[in-house]
Amino acid sequence: MAEQIIRVSQIGYLPEAKKFAILMTGDSGRWEYTRYDFSDLKEEGWHQLKIGEAVSDSFLISKHVYDGLADFPLNYMRQQRCGWNPFTGDSCHQKDGYIIYHPTKTGQHIDVRGGWHDASDCLQYATTTGNAIYQMMLAYEQYPELFGDMYQTNGTPGANGIPDIVDEIRWGLDWLDRMNPAPGEFYNQLADDRDHIGMRFPKDDQADYGWGVNNGRPVYFVTGEPQVQGKGMNISTGTSSIVGKYASCFALGSKILAPYYPELAERIGEKAKDAYDLGVRKPGFSQTASVRSPY
């Protein structure tokens, strides 16, 4: 007998909204999809759908189904935190990192703990971090009333008088601040694809970049020129693509953090113009660097 699965909205539905479910029927390695319209169901409360022998997960119909939803993605951001994870209650990557590609500081240690692990590996990029920060800042700037306060700055449960999205913005900006330790000194990337050695928790990282297992990762200095550690060069042509993200995040971040974290707000506000000026002096794009498999 073919397997049947019903997919419904995990969030739920407004009473007067259109409502659809997808019936997935699988047989011999092939899936067929059928869409069902149940918009006539408007009764508030928890429901399930039954189609043939298949039964859906429970879903909610309510006028308040979207209440608090703006805070939900922050669970993912907290889960991705590097340095200390509030979900697991443990630390990781406490010895990051060691500078590479800097004309005078290569091999020196720099404290760049924090930020978020990127995707499903442990790599960290200033460009994706900047994108994540700016999207959160833009959402908060336009709709501050939608965000609650249920977590501490470190991501553990408990209100602290600061909107949770501001705490998460601060977590990201603190890392970008560390990745820009001095005027004209910007870093683009922490770790590289030597990380891709199998699934494990960040605290159990077995990657060795030359300083011993889980004993610090490389931090790539922004040169605006091609870089590589392995098979092929990237094609970086300048700095503006990355330092522009620093500039925009620092400028808007300074404004958003000022009521809550004035010291960090002032520091990054002063750094914003330096980032902008470097982009003007050396226009072009900065790509990330890979070692094992150029991408």
Language model: regions and residue ranges:
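Extended ligand-binding groove/face enriched in aromatic
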Residues: 78-128, 155-249, 260, 266-277, ...
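Well-ordered alpha-helical scaffold segments within catalytic/enzyme domains
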Residues: 21, 51, 122, 133-155, ...
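Low-complexity, Pro/Ser/Thr- and charge-rich linker/hinge segments at domain boundaries
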Residues: 56-91
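Generic alpha-helical propensity signal that fires on short helical segments
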Residues: 24-31, 77-79, 150, 204
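Ligand-binding face of N-terminal immunoglobulin V-set domains in extracellular IgSF glycoproteins
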Residues: 3-66
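Surface-exposed beta-strand edges and their flanking turn/coil or helix-capping segments
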Residues: 20-23, 50-51, 71-76, 201-203
